[in-house]
Amino acid sequence: MTTLAWFAGRSMVLDLAALTSAFTVGYLLKSTSTPTSTPTSTDKAGTPPGSTIHHYGYPQGSVTKPNNSKTEKENGSPKDSKGNVPDCPYKYLVGLYGHHHFAGFVEALQPTLKDEDPEKYTLVLDIMDAVHLCLILVDDICDDSPKRKNQTTAHLLFGSCETANRAYLVLTKVINRAMRTRPVLGAELVRALELILEGQDLSLVWRRDGLAAFDAEEGGDKVSVYKKMAQLKTGTLFVLLGRLLNDGGAQLDDVLLRLGWYSQLQNDCKNIYSGEYANNKGAIAEDLRNGEMSFPVVVALGDQTTSSQIRKAFGSHSDGDIFDALDALQSSCIKNKCSQALQEAGRGLENLLAIWGRREHMDSLGS
């Protein structure tokens, strides 16, 4: 599918209330990690009326906001200039990733922008920080992730409600700022958010309704179906950067879409094959445990020697079945296919990948 086909027919301006609603529905229906909710009806495969759905997300029990106690400081959480943990989930995450996380890309793609148009340079980087980090804030809530970059996740420090609301607030402010000062960039931002949330919503539906929903998807082989979702959810983030730099121009769409696909593949593989990544996230095979589709899972579903283990794990979510599925994912056949796909996806992107980093070692893939 071409990039132009993806974006065809997308409105340049989306009502802000609709955007906020989409953001909320796409993420926060995952309301608890322990209780279940019962739908009244459904037209989705694999979720018959009256059945219960296990929702991953908000942790049970009390959470405390960060303080300046000795215990908090010993945890190594990001501090401000006075040695205090930031009293804001977004600033806390900025402390983990660094301010203007995409600056290296901007300097490589438009090296003169900072001097020629410093206002645009700052706005572009602020937009990219807001989209990237706010999506991470809410994604960690959905996955009930205990760690991010080997630090306690924001929602476990500040609470899920405050963390999610702060993400909406930061995004709303940057949308209004862009629409007011650079309307073309504002329109690109809104369009990108719609596409990203469309991809994330599809991923969450698959997680909610299980493999029956994924199997029911049309559009060719299952790798292609998964890739389409990943290009919406992750590829659009990188495409947005090119659109912002080129005032809506599509000159960089193809290469940045490829970079986004590589990033998704790399993240999926690290989730299964990197002990370092598991330590930084505080969980092994988090995607598999959450019943979430990933590239290794899709590959294993298409292999007769591993399909049954994956399907059993997605059906039961039991620890024993999950460990059996993890063994299947780490078999040489599946590892080799994932390694080959990762190498092919990265061809010609070496310079951009060097800027992106993400160098956690993957023992099982020999990288």
Curated annotation (Swiss-Prot):
Gene3D superfamilies: Farnesyl Diphosphate Synthase
Binding site for substrate: H132, R148, K233, T234, Q264, N271, K281
Function: Prenyltransferase; part of the gene cluster that mediates the biosynthesis of paspalitrems, indole-diterpene (IDT) mycotoxins that are potent tremorgens in mammals. The geranylgeranyl diphosphate (GGPP) synthase idtG is proposed to catalyze the first step in IDT biosynthesis via catalysis of a series of iterative condensations of isopentenyl diphosphate (IPP) with dimethylallyl diphosphate (DMAPP), geranyl diphosphate (GPP), and farnesyl diphosphate (FPP), to form GGPP.
EC class (word): transferase
Protein name as annotated: Prenyltransferase idtC
Disruption phenotype: Simultaneous disruption of idtB, idtC, idtF and idtG eliminates the biosynthesis of the whole spectrum of indole-diterpenes reported to be produced by C.paspali, including paspaline, paxilline, paspalinine, paspalitrem A and paspalitrem B.
Top-level lineage group: Eukaryota
One function term, GO molecular function aspect: metal ion binding
Binding site for Mg(2+) 2: D139, D143
Disordered: annotated span: 32-84
Biased composition, class Low complexity, residue ranges: 32-42
Higher taxonomy: Eukaryota, Fungi, Dikarya, Ascomycota, Pezizomycotina
Gene behind this protein: idtC
Keyword Membrane: no
